[in-house]
């Protein structure tokens, strides 16, 4: 039988073959079979295939993370504070980070976004007593030095929560300073795989807490394409309704939405 391939069909076949070659390094085969059709190359099915591949790769990476003894204490402490603030308990048999994500997921499932912010803020207040936060606020008023110290402290102290990060240079009022934290791949976003949990359990309440309790404005800018995030100390965030992150639809394969019915 003679079959003629159009240009778009050829591109689809080539893309699928390349995708299988990439996956073969993991000793797995893609479930996508080369199909000849007249749809555009960047079709919905190929988008879904790419996202499935990203999720599987992320899960493989997460499985390799080994938290230190002190990291586990910090993770479980934050998880317990969030459970107490929301009046819930985690049913996860696992401890450490999986339980933290499970707790955050249950908060997202059972409460509206305003309540989510309140519970996270309450848990952060429990973790950092007012006396200590007030001292930090007085000792480090907004300045080039304090912004750089906040950035440095974040990279050193919070790898257990967000993953590896680094301090990057930026320009503030015409002067260069190292006050931006770049998170290569946010651990929380990667493991929860949920835009709604990123914005309402992490980003928004963290911005509010750091500014109100520690006196330091901060704007967190997640990139939902590569799961990276920038924390820009000293920069005021836009209003919640104007924040680009709030207009981002959740991933098609959002595990939290499918498993728990999380509302976005």
Swiss-Prot record:
CC terms in the record's Gene Ontology section: chloroplast; plastid
InterPro entries in alphabetical order: D27-like, D27-like_C
Single GO MF annotation: beta-carotene isomerase activity
Disruption phenotype: Increased shoot branching.
Pfam families named in the record: D27-like_C
Cofactor field: Fe cation
One GO-annotated biological process of the protein: secondary shoot formation
Transit peptide limits: 1-47
Compartment(s) where it occurs, according to its Swiss-Prot or TrEMBL record: Plastid, Chloroplast
Superkingdom, natural source: Eukaryota
Alphabetically ordered keywords of this record: Chloroplast, Iron, Isomerase, Metal-binding, Plastid, Transit peptide
Function: Involved in strigolactones biosynthesis by catalyzing the isomerization of the C9-C10 double bond in all-trans-beta-carotene leading to 9-cis-beta-carotene and providing the substrate for CCD7. Strigolactones are hormones that inhibit tillering and shoot branching through the MAX-dependent pathway, contribute to the regulation of shoot architectural response to phosphate-limiting conditions and function as rhizosphere signal that stimulates hyphal branching of arbuscular mycorrhizal fungi and trigger seed germination of root parasitic weeds.
Protein's name according to its UniProt entry: Beta-carotene isomerase D27, chloroplastic
Organism whose genome encodes this protein: Arabidopsis thaliana (Mouse-ear cress)
Gene assigned in the entry: D27
